[in-house]
Amino acid sequence: MKYRMNIAGLDRDLPLCKVSDDLYIGAFVMFGDAEITVACARELLARAPKDYDYLLTAEAKSIPLIHEMARQSGAREYFVARKGLKVYMPHPLHVTVRSITTQHDQDLYLSGEEADKIRGKRVLIVDDVISTGESLRAMEELVEKAGGTVAGRMAVLAEGDAQARKDIVYLNKLPVFNADGTVKE
């Protein structure tokens, strides 16, 4: 089963993936789709606040998006909250998150060097899909721990209850689905 939708002026068929017996989600994956990545970056930047210093996302599906947003905006640097601690990340900051797509606790890390750069700066948080808001909350916590300020929150798609949030900017709504592929009411 697939769900067809228009995203940043482009039609895409999202496969429906089982989360539980009565909940399916549309899988939006930008990996390998340069056309959608470029279009989404352009549309998000057109709606982005102008007063941010850095972009931040969580590993991994939003990395192509944030890279393209940095490229289009002329930003020389952006940050990716990593899902695992790496040896090249001394003095890291870390938070724990539970995401709908991973279905288990997951840690996110910023290196001490990245945290130092964020201190006193305004950070625009970017994600591919905001659903439960847990990944977003974890990135907000990392920014705050680093001494930065959240300048805004953006996503390509808002899924389920996230569509009602007033504190995020997104390009389109992504419904959640029943097992038969119909949209959940």
Language-model features, listed with the residues they occupy:
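Conserved G/P- and acidic residue-centered "switch" motifs that form tight phosphate/ATP-binding loops
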Residues: 128, 133
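Gly/Ser/Thr-rich loops at beta-strand to alpha-helix junctions
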Residues: 59-65
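Short glycine-rich phosphate-binding loop at a beta-alpha junction
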Residues: 52-59
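Active-site-facing substrate-recognition patch
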Residues: 1-52
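Short Gly/Thr/Asp-enriched flexible loops that form oxyanion-binding sites at enzyme active sites
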Residues: 65-73, 140
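PRPP-dependent phosphoribosyltransferase catalytic core
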Residues: 2-4, 137-185
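Conserved acidic residues
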Residues: 53, 121, 151
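Short, glycine/charge-rich flexible loops or terminal/linker lids adjacent to PRPP-binding catalytic cores
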Residues: 77-123
